[in-house]
């Protein structure tokens, strides 16, 4: 039997507390705690998550292979430019934007246009048939792009381990859940756990991962604020109010690979 545990999570930063608190001791936000039910079985970690991850070992500085200069061409000059010349292998990139702004279309374009790269597009919001129809409208073909409609993190990690793609797109982080937790997809604990697992996989295997995140009414990315600190790059996708409504603007809000950081 799994041991059921109730906990309270801050919606702003993801801080966990055993009881409700009026003010978060981590970020200082008031009235931000929500109760979630977590079910964990003692000592149980799904093999699909724990198995494929290589174990890192300490290395001397002189023995570490330099790869910072290597960037992958995504086949889209504008996206490459925003990312500083291409995508760094093993990076976790968060793409945020309003509903309907075109996050899924942009991410599918990237997956299809990345010639020479094996890509995996994971959708928790559309069927394979719907994605194929959208790909047809985009008009870009890529035989190395795999489509996988799934929401269970353990299954997603297993498919990534099996196919070993260079690039993975997760659409969206709010629809993904892990069996390690009993809370619903999109909850603070689920978003934090899934993002942390994807980050660990990206760093240990060199697989680059794009995750799409929805934004709230106030313009911030839905989920705990810690999500933006877990990822390597935060891209904001929005409309250009000064130009045509069909024009979209991509902004790099944060990047570990920026020369200014």
Descriptions of predicted regions:
Residues 90, 98, 108-197:
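Conserved inter-motif catalytic segment of the P-loop NTP-binding fold
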Residues 250-261:
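Positively charged, low-complexity/disordered segments
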Residues 175, 217, 255:
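Residues immediately C-terminal
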Residues 2-5, 16-93, 113, 117-118:
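Detector for small/aliphatic-rich hydrophobic stretches
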Residues 199-251:
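Phosphate-binding/switch region of NTP-binding enzymes
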Residues 103:
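Conserved lysine of the Walker
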Residues 11, 25-28, 247:
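Cys/His/Pro-rich metal-binding microdomains
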